[in-house]
Regions:
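Mixed-charge, Lys/Arg-enriched low-complexity segments
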Residues: 1-20, 60-82
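Acidic, low-complexity, intrinsically disordered interaction modules
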Residues: 17-71
Length: 82
């Protein structure tokens, strides 16, 4: 899925549904790509991309957003060795 990034009013609901509330402050809202909300982790600088409606997770690869599982998405954000 290819989408242009739009920056506007932050939507924190997808993130709040995906991670414990104490971890939400570790992320910055970066914008939206279609229905996918983009968050960047303040320390690892990695993205957590979450569909605003379905809560599904995506990674950006080769110019497209590709659906991945929740565990893979969270591991990619928090794994400092990647």
């Amino acid at each position: 899925m290819k989408c242009e990034i739009e920056v506007g009013k932050p939507d924190w609901r997808p993130l709040e549904n995906a991670v414990p509330s104490e971890f939400c402050e570790d992320f910055m809202f970066m914008g939206k790509a279609g229905g996918i909300v983009l968050y960047k982790h303040r320390i690892t600088r990695r993205y957590l991309n979450i569909d605003a409606v379905t809560g599904k997770f995506y990674r950006y690869a080769n110019g497209e957003y590709v659906e991945i599982g929740r565990r893979q998405a969270l591991d990619s954000v928090y794994d400092h060795d990647q």
